[in-house]
Curated annotation (Swiss-Prot):
Binding-site residues for Mg(2+) 2, renumbered to this chain: D103, D106, E270
Organism: Pseudoalteromonas atlantica (strain T6c / ATCC BAA-1087)
Protein name: Fructose-1,6-bisphosphatase class 1
The EC number(s) this enzyme carries: 3.1.3.11
Stated family: Belongs to the FBPase class 1 family.
An example Gene Ontology biological process: fructose metabolic process
Annotated HAMAP family: FBPase_class1 (MF_01855)
Entry GO terms, CC: cytosol
Length: 323
């Protein structure tokens, strides 16, 4: 099987980006080990602190964030990082050429039940005229991403990665410690009969989403004339991995509870990297009003609605917004 380095070189990734990705993934391998230790290492459960999002931090949130912050700060390739667990950007090397945004442990509420979790990341070029601690450096649309991916910590540790030449899947070979290519240029099926949404929020959805999901649930007796199954992992990384692997539509739409907060998922380190992977695999990614990758960020922890997955199904969903 082909190793990660070989595939990155084939895809034309510059050497410095390859070295940065290797550094980042070394941190992810350390996180994978910590996750696998679980209760044996005393890393389960919550801390007494909250992150900038107002969310109670799990112990593994804090550990994972520190691992990535340390390894990226020391690499020399990174000018600054932005993380879900950090209030502000973290300055690294003033001469670094890249910015890295990440969610160190997506789905961390699943740690205590031994369910799917993962690390999500995106990389952009660092504007050389900006200071390393200037958050405006990160306010670039997703179209500027040079690499994005996630590592899923499941029965095996799997990496989904794109540098703009397709989305590839790799599996961590724990015997030799490297990621091996296991699926090249994955293509998301254009059609699907699966959808992923947190149905407990149904009463808060806007009419287009209410109507669309209602038609899916109606199944073969409704206007879609076929049955759909709902899947929900409660970790974006797990749901997106399923969609990439076998198709589907994933939704975390705007709801009416807080008009000042247009979505649940963060643009820089959740929505953008997943949208990049999905488009590179032939899928679509939208806010309901436009392409996710074209959203111009206004702050590093900005949230957006998310609809992404199988091309034809996302197009069908978006047609409800135009009705």
């Amino acid at each position: 099987m082909k190793r990660l380095n070989s595939q990155l070189q084939e895809d034309g990734a510059p050497m410095e980006l390859i070295l940065l990705l290797r550094t980042l993934l070394a941190g992810c391998k350390e996180i994978s080990f910590r996750v696998s230790q679980g209760a044996l290492a005393g890393v389960l459960g919550s801390t007494l602190s909250e992150n900038v999002q107002g969310e109670t931090q799990k112990k593994l949130d804090v550990i994972s964030n520190q691992i990535l912050k340390d390894i990226l700060s020391e690499s020399g390739y990174v000018k600054a990082i932005s993380s879900e667990e950090e209030d502000d950007v973290v300055a690294c090397n003033p001469n670094g050429n890249y910015l890295v945004s990440f969610d160190p442990l997506d789905g961390s509420s699943n740690t205590d039940i031994n369910s799917l979790i993962g690390t999500i990341f995106s990389i952009t070029h660092a504007p050389q005229w900006m200071d390393a601690d200037d958050p405006s450096a990160f306010l670039q649309p997703g179209t500027q991403i040079v690499a994005a991916g996630y590592v899923l910590y499941g029965p095996s540790a799997m990496l989904a990665l794109s540098t703009g030449r397709g989305t590839h899947l790799y599996t961590l070979d724990k015997t030799h410690g490297g990621f091996l290519l296991t699926q090249k240029n994955i293509q998301v099926p254009a059609q699907t009969s699966e959808f992923a949404i947190n149905a407990s929020n149904q009463r808060h959805w806007e009419d287009p989403v209410q109507n669309y999901i209602g038609d899916l649930i109606a199944g073969e007796d409704g206007p879609r004339e076929k049955d759909f199954n709902m899947r929900w992992v409660a970790a974006m990384v797990g749901d997106i991995h399923r969609v990439l692997s076998r198709g589907g539509i994933f939704m975390y739409p705007f709801d009416r509870r807080n008009p000042e907060m247009p979505g649940k998922l963060r643009l820089l380190y959740e929505a953008n990297p997943m949208a990049f992977l999905m488009e590179q695999a032939g899928g679509l990614a939208s806010t309901g009003q436009g392409r996710i990758l074209e959203v111009m960020p206004t702050e590093i922890h900005q949230r957006v609605p998310v609809i992404l997955g199988s091309k034809e199904e996302v197009e069908t969903c978006l047609s409800y917004y135009k009705a």
